[in-house]
Design a protein with these regions (language model features):
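Short, well-ordered beta-strand elements
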Residues: 27-37, 58-63, 85-86, 135, ...
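Extracytoplasmic/periplasmic solute-binding protein
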Residues: 131-139, 144, 169-221, 265
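Hinge/lid segment of periplasmic solute-binding proteins
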Residues: 91-145, 284-288, 352-368
C-alpha cells in the first residue's frame, strides 16, 4: 500500500461506502468507484453534476469507499462480473489487475485522440505504460519532502533545514532534537518521523541518493543488498538503533500513525497527501526538499490513476468519463483538495494548486522534486514483494537481527516473489 493512500483509512469514518447519482433519467448509466474520504465525496458530487451537464444522456453513479473496503469490494465485483465501468487504481497494484484481464486497453482511444495526453507530466505516465499500450492513466502524482516543526527547532536552537542539507546534516539535527523532556529516562521527542517498512516514503529515497537501485524486474533481482545500498541501510540503522532519533512503529503506537502530526517528532518525511492533515496543527511547520546523499538528491514518485473495466458495456462513454477526470476542470477541483500534485503541468503552475487555503507553504517544491524523482517500482506481485521485504526490515528495526542479516533475508525473499511472478 502506498502511504499517501493510507490517509483514506486514517481517521476517516465511512460506513463502508457512499453512493450517489446526479440525475434520474438517462440513456446510459455509468458507474465509477473510488477510494477516498469525506472531502473526496464532496468534490466528486460536484464533478458528477458537471460531467452530466457536458455529457447529456449519461447518468453517472459514483461510489467512494475507504482504502481497505475499496479493494475488498472491487475484488468481489470483478470476480462476480459486475465491475464498475470506471474505477480508481494505485500504480503499485496496476500490473496485477492488468495481468488478470480486468482492465480495458486504452491505447485505441489514445491513438484516436493523442492530444488528450498533451500537457500531462511524462513521468506520471510511466507507471501505466506497458509493451502494448496503456490500460490505465494517472489521476495525480506524489513526491516526498521533508517537513519540520519550527517550534521544536527554535526551542533547541537548531537552524531550519535548507536545500543544501545532506543526510549527515539531517542526522546531526535529529540527534540534537531527540530529547527526554521530562527526565524520566525515556525519549518523548524524536528527531525524525519516517516510515521504516514501506519503501515509498523514506528508505527508497535514501538508497537512491546513495547510488543504489531497488529492483531489476526484468532479471528478477532484488537489489537492496548492493554495496551502495548497504551504506544507505547502515546510515538508517545508525539513526534508528544507535542515535534512537527515529522512533519505531511500536514506540509511536500510543501517538498514532504519524509522529510528526502528533507533535512528537521534530521532522517527518511524507508526501503532499499529509498537507491537509498538518494544517490544523497547533505548532508552526515548514517544508524543505529531501536531503542530498553521496549520489545526489532523490525522491520516489507514485500515483493514483483511473482504469476502465474490460467488461464494461459502455466503453466509449467510460472513456469520456476518464478524459473528464484527468482533464483541466477536474484536475483543478482535485488540486484544491491538497492531497496530491495534479498530472496537468499547467495546473501545477496555477493558483488552483499553488494557492491552497490554510496551507501557505511552497507547494512548488513538490513539483520541483520531479527533476530528481525515481519512479516507484511497478511490477506484478509488488504487494507480495513489499510484504516480504517489510517483514525482514521489521526484524532489523526491532533489534531482532543485525541490519545486514535482515537485508540478506529481504533479498532472498524478494527474489522468490519475483521468480513466482515472472
Amino acid at each position: 500500500m502506498t502511504d499517501w493512500l493510507g490517509r483514506v483509512s486514517r481517521g476517516v469514518a465511512l460506513a463502508g461506502s457512499v453512493l450517489w447519482c446526479a440525475t434520474a433519467q438517462a440513456d446510459t448509466e455509468l458507474t465509477m468507484t473510488l477510494f477516498g474520504g469525506p472531502v473526496d465525496i464532496a468534490v466528486w458530487q460536484r464533478l458528477s453534476a458537471d460531467f452530466e451537464k457536458t455529457h447529456p444522456g449519461i447518468k453517472l453513479k459514483v461510489e467512494v469507499n475507504d482504502w481497505d473496503s475499496y479493494w475488498e469490494k472491487l475484488r468481489v465485483l470483478v470476480a462476480g462480473g459486475t465491475a464498475p465501468d470506471v474505477f480508481a487504481m494505485d500504480a503499485s497494484n496496476y500490473p496485477d489487475w492488468q495481468a488478470r484481464g480486468a482492465l480495458l486497453k486504452l491505447q485505441p482511444f489514445i491513438d484516436a485522440e493523442p492530444d488528450q495526453l498533451k500537457g500531462v507530466f511524462p513521468i506520471s505516465l510511466e507507471a501505466y505504460k506497458t509493451p502494448d499500450g496503456y490500460y490505465g492513466l494517472p489521476r495525480d502524482i506524489q513526491t516526498i519532502a521533508l517537513f519540520y516543526n519550527k517550534d521544536m527547532f527554535d526551542d533547541a536552537g537548531v537552524a531550519y533545514p535548507t536545500d543544501s542539507w545532506t543526510w549527515d546534516d539531517l542526522r546531526a539535527a535529529a540527534k540534537k532534537l531527540t530529547r527526554d523532556k521530562n527526565g524520566d529516562g525515556t525519549i518523548d521527542q524524536w528527531g525524525l518521523f519516517a516510515e521504516l517498512i514501506d519503501m515509498e516514503v523514506f528508505w527508497s529515497s535514501v538508497l537512491w541518493s546513495y547510488g543504489a537501485e531497488i529492483v531489476d524486474v526484468k532479471n528478477g533481482k532484488t537489489l537492496i543488498g548492493s554495496p551502495e545500498a548497504m551504506k544507505a541501510w547502515n546510515f538508517i540503522a545508525g539513526m534508528v538503533l544507535d542515535d534512537k532519533s527515529i522512533p519505531t512503529s511500536e514506540q509511536l503506537r500510543q501517538f498514532g500513525l504519524d509522529g510528526f502530526q502528533a507533535g512528537v517528532t521534530a521532522m517527518g518525511v511524507s508526501g503532499h497527501w499529509s498537507v491537509p492533515d498538518y494544517v490544523p496543527a497547533t505548532f508552526k511547520w515548514g517544508v524543505a526538499p529531501m536531503p542530498k546523499g553521496p549520489a545526489g538528491r532523490a525522491t520516489s514518485i507514485n500515483s493514483a490513476g483511473f482504469t476502465i473495466s474490460s467488461t464494461t458495456q459502455h466503453p466509449k462513454e467510460a472513456w469520456e468519463l476518464l478524459k473528464f477526470a484527468i482533464g483541466p476542470h477536474a484536475q483543478e477541483e482535485l488540486a484544491q483538495l491538497g492531497f496530491a500534485i495534479p498530472i496537468q503541468e499547467a495546473i501545477t503552475a496555477s493558483p488552483a494548486y499553488l494557492v491552497q487555503k490554510n496551507a501557505p507553504i511552497d507547494h512548488k517544491l513538490f513539483v520541483d522534486a520531479l527533476a530528481y524523482a525515481h519512479l516507484k517500482p511497478v511490477f506484478k506481485g509488488y504487494e507480495e514483494w513489499a510484504s516480504a521485504v517489510g517483514d525482514a526490515l521489521h526484524r532489523a528495526w526491532s533489534g531482532e537481527v543485525p541490519i545486514a542479516d535482515a537485508i540478506h533475508e529481504a533479498v532472498a525473499a524478494g527474489d522468490e516473489v519475483l521468480a513466482n511472478n515472472r
